[in-house]
């Protein structure tokens, strides 16, 4: 009987992994600048490669498509790092759900919203604007909206379980309210167009969420 041949294991040195990570980061940084300054449709893979200082082939090898670049960039900005951990498994999200005080819970949610939007709000508009003409991005935008609503619903459900929701407000309507207050379009209107500071937005979001959702808003953290 012929001896079985074990497949050769591919060895990647730490240095090579570091170089690959640096190349990926350079491409994403270049793509972010181009997408946010001139939009998705105008930005080409060649332009991304040139801005990143890499070959066009490298961009295709790493991300395959332009929508793949945008999708990877979105996940990076949403999560704040390259770790493949969904939002609903992030420590900061679980801290919101675990917060026992209803008002502090909503204000912590507002703070996290401000932090994420400072990183990712501009790219959200790029994705939204490109979605009608690109099936991949249409699916990404739909998923963003769905996940966003589901996360806010989970927060409202936790308030409902503790009897903290204002009378007459059920979980579904409360989730819609919190989702609307937390929507990136409102950030764009208030911060982008009206010139509110991110801190003003966070305070308004927290105040409004408490007044709309909670049975008895407290003094809270101002």
Model segments located where?
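Helix-turn-helix
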Residues: 26, 30, 34-68, 72
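Short, basic, alpha-helical segments at the C-terminal edge of helix-turn-helix-like DNA-binding modules
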Residues: 45, 74-81
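Hydrophobic alpha-helical connector segments
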Residues: 72, 83-118, 175
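Hydrophobic/aromatic-rich alpha-helical bundle segments in the mid-to-C-terminal region
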Residues: 160-208, 220-222
